[in-house]
Amino acid sequence: MALSDLVLLRWLRDSRHSRKLILFIVFLALLLDNMLLTVVVPIIPSYLYSIKHEKNTTEIQTARPALTASTSESFHSIFSYYNNSTVFTGNATGGLPGGESPKATTTQHTVTNTTVPPDCPSEDKDLLNENVQVGLLFASKATVQLLTNPFIGLLTNRIGYPIPMFAGFCIMFISTVMFAFSSSYAFLLIARSLQGIGSSCSSVAGMGMLASVYTDDEERGNAMGIALGGLAMGVLVGPPFGSVLYEFVGKTAPFLVLAALVLLDGAIQLFVLQPSRVQPESQKGTPLTTLLKDPYILIAAGSICFANMGIAMLEPALPIWMMETMCSRKWQLGVAFLPASISYLIGTNIFGILAHKMGRWLCALLGMIVVGISILCIPFAKNIYGLIAPNFGVGFAIGMVDSSMMPIMGYLVDLRHVSVYGSVYAIADVAFCMGYAIGPSAGGAIAKAIGFPWLMTIIGIIDIVFAPLCFFLRSPPAKEEKMAILMDHNCPIKTKMYTQNNVQPYPVGDDEESESD
């Protein structure tokens, strides 16, 4: 037994420097972060709606206590806004003592409720107002993450990737527990905003860590495709996982399960990454302002932003639109996103490998066009089955864009700047967050003002119009001084021009040459 323990400890010690184990840690962190991101999608609209109408019901009962005894048996049916169901209580007049007839106000209230289909909320104005409220709640996470990313990028350049990665775990655990026990809009908003800080740490540090250990362009693309598969699985599992547990167990259950999984991720990070050790970069990275002036980095970031903005606009608006037009039950609000999540997982895994062969710029261009066309088709759905094909197209196409653009960001830094990746993946995450910040907040307001179909039309056209810009990523030029370094046979980085047919193999030297001024 002691010998087997020693063997296990030796294997774990040797595995600390394994690239595959680091890839697994990043995969798991992105998986859990995006499960928490999307598990709230089917829960929040219905939960906020139930909170509001339970409060209204309590106020009505408090204002008219004298009517309680005389009208408790006069209802033929009672409609519950909490679970969208109608409870039948018996004959409307047979149970009245002394044959008394109900008051006019009570009779009017009963007629109003019984005319509503059992699965459709009747307060259309409340649902329209909820578009804005839910949109702002969803956007708060991305907005905070957007503001935090530049600082995390600079921090990783100074102290390395393990400490920010572990800090992301700690913050995400606190946020998950807050979600579980929050019972008001204000606390939900705080929990969602706090998640943005944790996500910034995990995303920037995780992608930067992968770029630093996978220096070959093809290997880096494959690794990031796998890591984005974790993101895809989180998006895939989150909505149905949340909606099913919410309907059959309660709001707290999905968040407590997630909190337990986050603890497991933290334990693995603590042992493998040793986050107490400061590991600064060996060379000074390119300033963030310089990277932001690079037009090729901006095009890649724009592709990530606008592609993800489509699904970000869907998250708060689609469940509310389904409640209005399809009379959907709570579990259907999350399951509707299942085709997009499955296809995103397929897209990231296929094009993580295929994009390197056919050209990442081409994959991104085609992906942007498919995203736009699929989004334009969503308002034509008449039931949940009509959402399957367009949602599948949206998810698959976003998988094409993300799995192509994430490696290109690292490639552009290798080609045109200093190969330090914290800042460039902060920019990539900023682009992702801008989509998820602008999307829900603007989407909720637009859906309220001009309707859900016009919202889909606007973002669909934007994606299609932006697509041709990806052509400029076909063969981005290298800076002159950087090209001289890349052509050096001692350069540890293997690069590939996407217009070439063959990859020039560069032998890896034992020692890295320091950057010359």
Swiss-Prot record:
<keyword id="KW-0813">Transport</keyword>
<dbReference type="GO" id="GO:0002552">
    <property type="term" value="P:serotonin secretion by mast cell"/>
</dbReference>
<dbReference type="GO" id="GO:0001975">
    <property type="term" value="P:response to amphetamine"/>
</dbReference>
<dbReference type="GO" id="GO:0030667">
    <property type="term" value="C:secretory granule membrane"/>
</dbReference>
<feature type="transmembrane region" description="Helical; Name=2">
    <location>
        <begin position="133"/>
        <end position="153"/>
    </location>
</feature>
<feature type="topological domain" description="Extracellular">
    <location>
        <begin position="42"/>
        <end position="132"/>
    </location>
</feature>
<feature type="binding site">
    <location>
        <position position="235"/>
    </location>
    <ligand>
        <name>serotonin</name>
    </ligand>
</feature>
<keyword id="KW-0770">Synapse</keyword>
<feature type="binding site">
    <location>
        <position position="315"/>
    </location>
    <ligand>
        <name>serotonin</name>
    </ligand>
</feature>
<dbReference type="GO" id="GO:0015311">
    <property type="term" value="F:monoamine:proton antiporter activity"/>
</dbReference>
<feature type="modified residue" description="Phosphoserine; by CK2">
    <location>
        <position position="516"/>
    </location>
</feature>
<feature type="glycosylation site" description="N-linked (GlcNAc...) asparagine">
    <location>
        <position position="83"/>
    </location>
</feature>
<feature type="topological domain" description="Cytoplasmic">
    <location>
        <begin position="275"/>
        <end position="294"/>
    </location>
</feature>
<feature type="glycosylation site" description="N-linked (GlcNAc...) asparagine">
    <location>
        <position position="113"/>
    </location>
</feature>
<feature type="binding site">
    <location>
        <position position="436"/>
    </location>
    <ligand>
        <name>serotonin</name>
    </ligand>
</feature>
<keyword id="KW-0812">Transmembrane</keyword>
<feature type="binding site">
    <location>
        <position position="308"/>
    </location>
    <ligand>
        <name>serotonin</name>
    </ligand>
</feature>
<dbReference type="GO" id="GO:0009791">
    <property type="term" value="P:post-embryonic development"/>
</dbReference>
<feature type="glycosylation site" description="N-linked (GlcNAc...) asparagine">
    <location>
        <position position="91"/>
    </location>
</feature>
<feature type="transmembrane region" description="Helical; Name=4">
    <location>
        <begin position="193"/>
        <end position="213"/>
    </location>
</feature>
<feature type="topological domain" description="Cytoplasmic">
    <location>
        <begin position="466"/>
        <end position="517"/>
    </location>
</feature>
<dbReference type="GO" id="GO:0051610">
    <property type="term" value="P:serotonin uptake"/>
</dbReference>
<feature type="binding site">
    <location>
        <position position="231"/>
    </location>
    <ligand>
        <name>serotonin</name>
    </ligand>
</feature>
<feature type="modified residue" description="Phosphoserine; by CK2">
    <location>
        <position position="514"/>
    </location>
</feature>
<feature type="transmembrane region" description="Helical; Name=5">
    <location>
        <begin position="223"/>
        <end position="245"/>
    </location>
</feature>
<dbReference type="InterPro" id="IPR020846">
    <property type="entry name" value="MFS_dom"/>
</dbReference>
<feature type="transmembrane region" description="Helical; Name=12">
    <location>
        <begin position="444"/>
        <end position="465"/>
    </location>
</feature>
<comment type="function">
    <text>Electrogenic antiporter that exchanges one cationic monoamine with two intravesicular protons across the membrane of secretory and synaptic vesicles. Uses the electrochemical proton gradient established by the V-type proton-pump ATPase to accumulate high concentrations of monoamines inside the vesicles prior to their release via exocytosis. Transports a variety of catecholamines such as dopamine, adrenaline and noradrenaline, histamine, and indolamines such as serotonin. Regulates the transvesicular monoaminergic gradient that determines the quantal size.</text>
</comment>
<keyword id="KW-0532">Neurotransmitter transport</keyword>
<keyword id="KW-0597">Phosphoprotein</keyword>
<feature type="transmembrane region" description="Helical; Name=1">
    <location>
        <begin position="21"/>
        <end position="41"/>
    </location>
</feature>
<feature type="disulfide bond">
    <location>
        <begin position="120"/>
        <end position="327"/>
    </location>
</feature>
<feature type="topological domain" description="Cytoplasmic">
    <location>
        <begin position="414"/>
        <end position="417"/>
    </location>
</feature>
<feature type="topological domain" description="Extracellular">
    <location>
        <begin position="439"/>
        <end position="443"/>
    </location>
</feature>
<dbReference type="GO" id="GO:0030425">
    <property type="term" value="C:dendrite"/>
</dbReference>
<dbReference type="GO" id="GO:0030424">
    <property type="term" value="C:axon"/>
</dbReference>
<feature type="topological domain" description="Cytoplasmic">
    <location>
        <begin position="356"/>
        <end position="360"/>
    </location>
</feature>
<keyword id="KW-0325">Glycoprotein</keyword>
<dbReference type="GO" id="GO:0051615">
    <property type="term" value="P:histamine uptake"/>
</dbReference>
<dbReference type="InterPro" id="IPR004734">
    <property type="entry name" value="Multidrug-R"/>
</dbReference>
<feature type="transmembrane region" description="Helical; Name=11">
    <location>
        <begin position="418"/>
        <end position="438"/>
    </location>
</feature>
<dbReference type="GO" id="GO:0098691">
    <property type="term" value="C:dopaminergic synapse"/>
</dbReference>
